Amino acid sequence: MLTPRVLRALGWTGLFFLLLSPSNVLGASLSRDLETPPFLSFDPSNISINGAPLTEVPHAPSTESVSTNSESTNEHTITETTGKNAYIHNNASTDKQNANDTHKMPNILCDTEEVFVFLNETGRFVCTLKVDPPSDSEWSNFVLDLIFNPIEYHANEKNVEAARIAGLYGVPGSDYAYPRQSELISSIRRDPQGTFWTSPSPHGNKYFIWINKTTNTMGVEIRNVDYADNGYMQVIMRDHFNRPLIDKHIYIRVCQRPASVDVLAPPVLSGENYKASCIVRHFYPPGSVYVSWRQNGNIATPRKDRDGSFWWFESGRGATLVSTITLGNSGIDFPPKISCLVAWKQGDMISTTNATAIPTVYHHPRLSLAFKDGYAICTIECVPSEITVRWLVHDEAQPNTTYNTVVTGLCRTIDRHRNLLSRIPVWDNWTKTKYTCRLIGYPFDEDKFQDSEYYDATPSARGTPMVITVTAVLGLAVILGMGIIMTALCLYNSTRKNIRL
């Protein structure tokens, strides 16, 4: 019976003030295990004005911040006024219905929901704290937590799996390191004397936080932004029981325009397809770049079965994207002008650039190798003027002093091309020797254009004339020997007859 009477006497509003009052008796009677659990694992209520260390929050931004933030402040003023008018308008009917209720829920109004900030620069946002009535005792019941939550752009399903297989994922300092953990940047309280206190930032001067007591605004700066700062800030207002009342998210979008755009169109042989690669270096975040292709000013569409794109992330430098395309080559028309158009987009910011390349086309040369008069002779037709000849014997390059090359005339079918003839003495060493005539100066594999033949100097390969010669010599020797023997016998017989007579 006592409880209903107390409720009727105090009213629900009075009971609400009683619960919010910093009474040691009431606080001791409530078990923390029965309260609503906090959003994250830390407990901001452990950071109190009686604990150490704490730092007094500056009451105004630095001179540099004021000068660089004049435009931002004006925008914030407009946003705050608009938000305030909307707040009053939207809650007019509620105020009339609750005219006797002097306590309202607190609120936080921030000047933006997204902060786009370029690499190594400073990002800023301002929030207005709405507490009614804004008395010192009322302020003392609230805690403002500033929490950073990362967003990792440095991995996708394919390259993360490859990194796991290679044992690189999660290695500190690698491109696949685990993302930065969510962490409490600051926990702010206000004492009854009107002084704001905050816990030290875990990153030193990385974050600068200030509060204007007159306008009840809080400003936050993230200095020297890097890729690890890509994420969102949570501004959470909690009551003295650590229960979240308001939770605002402000996204920090780290930006970096592409540092360079290049098109690589490697040389091709006449009749082979053209291939080109567009390389967009050092931008952020991945996915903010869009690539399109042009061939002689006309739209060219990559084929899914042979073209595509891929990207990788370099620590401290950003993302790099490579897009490829394959185009037909009739072998008759002039090589095309291949252009890559790149658009980088973040929020309302757009940056475009392009690059162009024209591939070089080479024609197939004609060459043949033969042996004549003790020389290996290489005949070459229709090669550019920068092409030279290199001889190899048993696949070993020979000094250019051992052979000579001359220009025999101009190519009749291709302009600015010429014909060559080169020769080198063969080795008459009674063995089988390999000779190679190779063209040097083409932007392809070194052995792309060459011809090889074997010169066989073994006795069996010298042919029938050699056998006939040897046989003739041996036969002549036998005949001469027999003639000498017969002559000697005749002389011997005639001498014996003369002696008998």
UniProtKB/Swiss-Prot annotation:
Its main location: secreted. The chain crosses the membrane at residues 466-492. It is found in: Secreted; Host cell membrane. Residues 28-465 are virion surface. Residues 62-72 have a biased composition (Low complexity). Residues 1-27 form the signal peptide. GO terms for cellular component: extracellular region; host cell plasma membrane; membrane. Residues 53-87 are annotated as: Disordered. It comes from the Viruses. Residues 493-501 are cytoplasmic. Residues 258-356 form the Ig-like domain. It is a single-pass membrane protein. Glycans are attached at residues 46, 91, 100, 120, 212, 354, 400, 429. Keywords: Glycoprotein, Host cell membrane, Host membrane, Host-virus interaction, Immunoglobulin domain, Membrane, Secreted, Signal, Transmembrane, Transmembrane helix. May play an immunoevasive role in the pathogenesis of Marek's disease. It is a candidate for causing the early-stage immunosuppression that occurs after MDHV infection. Belongs to the herpesviridae glycoprotein C family. This is Envelope glycoprotein C homolog.
